[in-house]
């Protein structure tokens, strides 16, 4: 019996060896074939990325995973576009579908594993029980004699195989326990996921309900807000309209107040004094009545806080007086009546501007009666009842203003004339005084100089002309000099009357005027001098042109006279042969100087005055 298991074990070992050898051969052949295939793949698809040490593997390449996820999302989106409405799913349904599909896959895998394990167990059991097959296999084989070392080796191999089987069984048991634990954990996770999905669905439903309620509440609030905004707009438009009416009424009140002040100013003083007396009488009567009322109120017993009631009544009375007038004013303006008799109690009277003042009421101050009547609420009385009265007053004022304007214009004209004449006379007198002063100084200086020169000349004459004095020749020369100096003096001063001055005095005056002219010429700006020079040059050119034209006319007349004389002269008949042009000798032209030399007026004046 011991031989049979040993033979069986040896056979099993040989079978295992054969199977291992076949596996090694197949693996070696596959390894030999694999490099060829890899070389072909490398030739077809390029170098292997695993050869690069900096290359990420396929399961760690984030960029590749991102591209895959993006492509997957795009494909799902395209698929969703092509799908119908009833085929599409929400996110929660997708998640639940994924969970269910995973669960089904796991269940199918578990079933397949169970079936495979059962099939393997049945196969092993049938193989162990099939002893006849084992006997038939081992019956006809030659059993070789075994040694102790071979036996030990076989036992050792059996032990190793048994140990390997035990290790594998323990590992299988451990993996089974881990699988059961993992299944339990997956079941718990599945249950928790189902609970979470249910809670999430409930939360989504509650959120939808709350969002619907919030939308309804928001719609109600928006409707109420829009209604309130419309009401506010209507009220603001009404307020703006009322404010515009109030401002318009205030403007009209201001205008009417100005008109009233103007009418009060135009009214006579007697009427104003009478109105003031009447108003003072009414005021005194009112004060007496108020004092009697206060005494009666203070004397009545049983009233608590009479002072407070009196104050409240006075306050209510003031408010009634303040609010009564604008309300009455608005009513009158709406009815179309002209509220010319009303005025604002809070606004001051504005001054009215008038062209001229009336002697009766224009200069008189505004009486206090108008303010009091306004405060009392009574209609103010006016002196003017018809517009014709105002027109008459305006006509009188206009006549007075016209007469005053004429008088003022005449007085202004006379004042201007008097001031002008006074100024001119003052300037002329100042100029004459200065001139006389200068003349006095020059005369005194010239007298001293002349006395010195006379003394010197007398001394020289006595020295050089001792015994050779000719009085007649000296007198004639002095008379000619005196005539020339007088002519120059008249041209310089512009006086045609005969002066009773001596030659020396006339020469000093001429010299003084020449100095003044030179000084004035220095003070005159260069532009004016240039303008005067241009004007002089222009006059000179015009004069030269005129003289040239006259000379041309004279020459033309002479030419005409010569032509006329030539025409009237007898015709001379030519005799002999006419000279040819080539044999005609050249005519000798003699240059004749023109006798008509033109001299400029300025040169004549220079020659006359300075030679």
UniProtKB/Swiss-Prot annotation:
Principal place of residence: cytoplasm
Biased composition (Polar residues): 1-17
GO biological process: one example: inner dynein arm assembly
Location in the cell: Cytoplasm, Cytoskeleton, Cilium axoneme
InterPro entries noted in UniProt: CFAP_domain-containing, DUF4200
Coiled-coil parts of chain: 101-128, 164-203, 230-257, 393-432, 526-578
Chain spans, region Disordered: 1-57, 287-323, 338-380
Biased composition (Low complexity): 20-32, 338-357
GO cellular component, one term: motile cilium
The entry's keywords: Cell projection, Cilium, Coiled coil, Cytoplasm, Cytoskeleton
Any one Gene Ontology molecular-function term assigned to this protein's record: dynein complex binding
Bias (Basic and acidic residues): 33-47
Main function: May play a role in ciliary/flagellar motility by regulating the assembly and the activity of axonemal inner dynein arm.
Family of the protein in this entry: Belongs to the CFAP100 family.
Protein name (database record): Cilia- and flagella-associated protein 100
Organism the protein comes from: Homo sapiens (Human)
Biological classification of the source: Eukaryota, Metazoa, Chordata, Craniata, Vertebrata
